Curated annotation (Swiss-Prot):
This is Small ribosomal subunit protein uS5. GO terms for molecular function: rRNA binding; structural constituent of ribosome. The gene is rpsE. Keywords: Ribonucleoprotein, Ribosomal protein, RNA-binding, rRNA-binding. The keyword Transferase does not apply. GO terms for cellular component: cytosolic small ribosomal subunit.
Length: 172
């Protein structure tokens, strides 16, 4: 696994490289080596995308992954640098549990999840991985969980209630 790089290009997006693997294809004449890169791209304000790229050279694979991540960005509702509610994301044999944390708690998450949260602009969150710790699965499970997040206003509209009813604010 390569070191995690943080880059900012002219478009203001935060790019992070999660993993680079050397892959081998065995053919009749021998082995063909290539590189596979996994990256995440975020805007620091709730938008995040994941990309994979393959090439015979590392920089080309990383660039392909960054381009794919830019094209696959999703918007996630945030609340003061954390998430609105607890959520579970799944992908393959990986299960990711995320819950909001108080201001000043920091990011309590391991490896690839930390990179996703940094690129998104989440500063206070607690997260745990159960099952497979493959970086590809962790990133996909994290994005699955984040895509399930809803704001209190969304939930109130869906249930036909007011936001105060959802949040349990006392009327007295």
């Amino acid at each position: 696994m390569a070191k995690h790089e943080i880059e900012e290009r002219g478009d203001g997006l935060i790019e992070k490289m999660v993993a680079v693997n050397r892959v081998t294809k065995v053919v009749k004449g021998g082995r063909i080596m290539a590189f596979s890169a996994l990256t995440v791209v975020g805007d620091g304000d709730g938008r995040i995308g994941m990309g994979k790229g393959k090439s015979k050279e590392v920089p080309v694979a990383v660039q392909k992954a960054m381009d794919q991540a830019r094209r696959s960005m999703i918007k996630v509702p945030l609340k003061n640098g954390t998430i609105h509610h607890e959520v579970i994301g799944r992908h393959g044999a990986t299960k990711v549990f995320m819950q909001p944390a108080k201001e000043g708690s920091g990011v309590k998450a391991g490896g690839p999840m930390r990179l996703v949260f940094d690129a998104m602009g989440i500063h206070n969150i607690s997260a745990k991985v159960h099952g497979s710790t493959n970086p590809y699965n962790i990133v996909r499970a994290t994005l699955d969980g984040l895509s399930k997040l809803h704001t209190p206003a969304d939930i109130a509209a869906k249930r036909g209630l007011t936001v105060e009813d959802i949040l349990g604010v006392n009327h007295g």
